[in-house]
Amino acid sequence: MARYEDLPYRTCVGMMLINREGLVFIGRRAGGIEHVDDTHVWQMPQGGVDPGEDTWEAAKRELYEETNVRSVEKIGEVPDWLIYDIPRTVAGRAWKGRYRGQRQKWFAVRFTGADSEIDVGAPGGHKPEFTGWRWEPMQNLPDLIVPFKRPVYERVVKEFSQLAVAV
């Protein structure tokens, strides 16, 4: 097995889905080895980029696969790739031990559909990644994510804070 320091980062996208009231979609994770407690189980949709796939196309695909949502318009993008390391204690089990963390390209989208479009139980025919969901004020997000992802969420919130307005 490769040393933790030598492992690459998984290329990934993240989506901040903002409704017409300026609130952000968060999903309650369906468990996982990084689970630390019942407060830090919420996150925004995110997922891997397939080889040769455009990041925006990957983001739309991941959003659909995790939430069933297609009714969106792109309203923002973090210009940089954001990186986080997973704790060494779970690195050997997460992603079959192939990565030390993720490098993420983040997008903000305005949700133009109705809440009834959201389905985390059988999203787009894929295995559910969330067991529930809710709309949350953007500034609360960093306190709801697993601690090792908090710096990324703080940066995403800072980048998109002006978008948390009712339209």
Swiss-Prot record:
One annotated GO molecular function: bis(5'-adenosyl)-pentaphosphatase activity
Alphabetically ordered keywords of this record: Hydrolase
Cofactor(s) the protein requires to work: a divalent metal cation
Listed EC numbers: 3.6.1.-
InterPro entries: NUDIX_hydrolase-like_dom_sf, NUDIX_hydrolase_CS, NUDIX_hydrolase_dom, RppH
Domain Nudix hydrolase: from-to ranges: 8-158
Motif (Nudix box): 47-68
GO BP: nucleoside phosphate metabolic process; ribose phosphate metabolic process
Pfam family of the protein (one): NUDIX
Domain of life from the UniProt record: Bacteria
Top enzyme class: hydrolase
Keyword hit for Metal-binding: no
Coiled coil (residue ranges): none
PROSITE patterns registered for this protein in UniProt: NUDIX (PS51462), NUDIX_BOX (PS00893)
Task of the protein: Accelerates the degradation of transcripts by removing pyrophosphate from the 5'-end of triphosphorylated RNA, leading to a more labile monophosphorylated state that can stimulate subsequent ribonuclease cleavage.
Family under the similarity heading: Belongs to the Nudix hydrolase family. RppH subfamily.
Official protein name in the record: RNA pyrophosphohydrolase
Organism name: Rhodopseudomonas palustris (strain BisB5)
